[in-house]
């Protein structure tokens, strides 16, 4: 297993009951700046992304009773949901991690340049770690989320 940095921290995902309420705190108290909002009823979530001095926070709210966000909130309450790393050649890195015995879940390809998976919290001391590449810039966010 390599000990070189896996990639750049892209964003911190936080599960919340209400993105509107959480947004008030992040903007009003911390001074964050709204980037965009996205809703995915099929996957059962709404998210907003906020910038705070170059760090992106992704706030996730459940939509519907079978939402992964709702299940998370019921089990753990509001708080850290995941860390996302932008990893060059993520498909190859994910294969390498699996080869090294790291338990991965939720592997999927959005396009040839956009591939992701999650390191299981059981393998990473309780933290869900998302590894991917091709994450959207603000200008591409709306187009990317249509995939």
Range-by-range predicted roles:
Residues 9-16, 23-26, 50, 57-60, ...:
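Short, structured motif recognition centered on aromatic/hydrophobic residues
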Residues 2-45, 52, 67:
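Long, hydrophobic N-terminal alpha-helical segment
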Residues 45, 52-54, 75-80:
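Short connector loops at helix/strand junctions that flank enzyme active sites
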Residues 1-21, 78-87, 136-147:
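N-terminal beta-strand motif that seeds the catalytic metal site of vicinal oxygen chelate
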Residues 2-5, 16-24, 48-51, 58, 63-64, 75-147:
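Vicinal oxygen chelate
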Residues 53-57, 64-66, 90:
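Short, charged/polar surface micro-motifs in flexible loops or helix N-caps
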């Amino acid at each position: 297993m390599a000990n070189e940095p896996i990639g750049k921290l892209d964003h911190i995902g936080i599960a919340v009951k209400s993105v509107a309420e959480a947004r008030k705190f992040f903007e009003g108290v911390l001074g964050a700046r709204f980037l965009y909002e996205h809703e995915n009823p099929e996957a059962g979530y709404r998210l907003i992304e906020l910038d705070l001095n170059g760090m992106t926070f992704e706030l996730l709210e459940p939509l519907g009773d079978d939402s992964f966000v709702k299940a998370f909130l019921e089990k753990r309450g509001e708080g850290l949901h995941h860390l996302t790393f932008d990893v060059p050649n993520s498909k190859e890195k994910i294969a390498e991690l699996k080869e090294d015995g790291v338990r991965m879940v939720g592997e999927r390809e959005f396009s040839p340049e956009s591939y992701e998976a999650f390191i299981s919290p059981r393998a990473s001391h309780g933290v869900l770690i998302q590894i991917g590449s091709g994450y959207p810039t603000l200008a591409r966010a709306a187009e990317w989320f249509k995939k």
